[in-house]
Design a protein with these regions (language model features):
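Metal-ion/cofactor- or nucleotide/acyl-coenzyme-handling active-site neighborhoods
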Residues: 1-177
Length: 177
């Protein structure tokens, strides 16, 4: 689950999809909408890179944390903030196997974890992209980063990532939730 608004806009349909597809895990590339999915009966994983630990603290109370936090492999150039209450459920990925760039990206961490968890289809939610012709420098950099990550995943795995919510990324296939 990425940080795009479609993760909220379509959350009931997404929850229904998860309930009907047993053996599904939820991997939060960002904790932005983690609170919205606490009631879903599926394993929860939270990618912690940079300030995502702070965002997790803001969105999930210690008593509501029922998942696993995942860190990128060491060294971590962006650093990582792990909330005190999550330290005993935090694990570090051994390595990133599908891409040589963007190893500290939350999207890379989420995809690597998904690769470790399944050999089936991987579904994305909330990777809306940034519409419009005028993007900020940060939006353009993130767009290019995600496009590279998605394309590399497809090249390495031979599979196309599927999005359950609308997305402007041409590197992924949008399927109806």
């Amino acid at each position: 689950i990425g940080g795009g608004f479609n993760a909220i806009e379509h959350k009931e349909a997404i929850k229904s999809f998860i309930e009907t597809h047993t053996n599904t895990a939820i991997i939060f590339a960002t904790a932005r909408y983690a609170r919205e999915y606490l009631d879903v009966n599926a394993p929860h994983f939270y990618c912690l890179v940079g300030n995502e630990g702070h965002r997790l603290t803001h969105n999930i109370n210690p008593q509501n944390l029922s998942g696993i936090c995942v860190l990128p492999p060491y060294p971590r150039p962006m650093g990582t903030e792990v909330p005190e209450y999550a330290k005993n459920v935090t694990f570090e990925l051994e390595n990133i196997t599908f891409i040589d760039q963007y190893k500290d990206s939350v999207t890379t961490i989420a995809l690597q974890l998904a690769i470790l968890l399944t050999d089936q289809d991987i579904y994305l939610v909330g990777y809306d992209g940034y519409p419009g012709n005028v993007l900020s420098e940060k939006e353009m950099a993130l767009t290019n980063e995600n496009r590279t990550i998605f394309a590399t995943y497809t090249t390495i795995s031979g599979k196309i990532l599927k999005s359950l919510t609308p997305s402007i990324y041409k590197e992924i296939e949008v399927v109806s939730v």
